[in-house]
């Protein structure tokens, strides 16, 4: 059995590593340098990555890559701002890519839409503001679910 794996490294001089796992052996196939990749997902023959702090206003970026047959990554366009600070999680849902912006407490859609959470949680020292940290489809793929540590809440989007 052969599996293709992508790992991101946010360290200095980091980037995205492509490995092949075959017969229990892991082999590096390619390396794509990029600025502080935080989280990656693959959707069909595309790879999406959150870039930690790639704009002058310190917002995170969302970069799309085409995965070539060799596993090499080819960038598609330039990074797009997630309109938030410290994006930390991605998911694909109904043809769009969504990013959770941790410090901004918001959800960004690749269509350009932004939903900002408001309020605070019951623990003022830890929950002074929204901290959106996860986004994923519901198990039946009818809804988009988002968790927010700062509000101690789960949001459901349809």
Model-flagged regions — what are they?
Residues 7-11, 49-56, 99-103, 138, ...:
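Conserved beta-strand positions in repeat-built beta-propeller and related beta-rich domains
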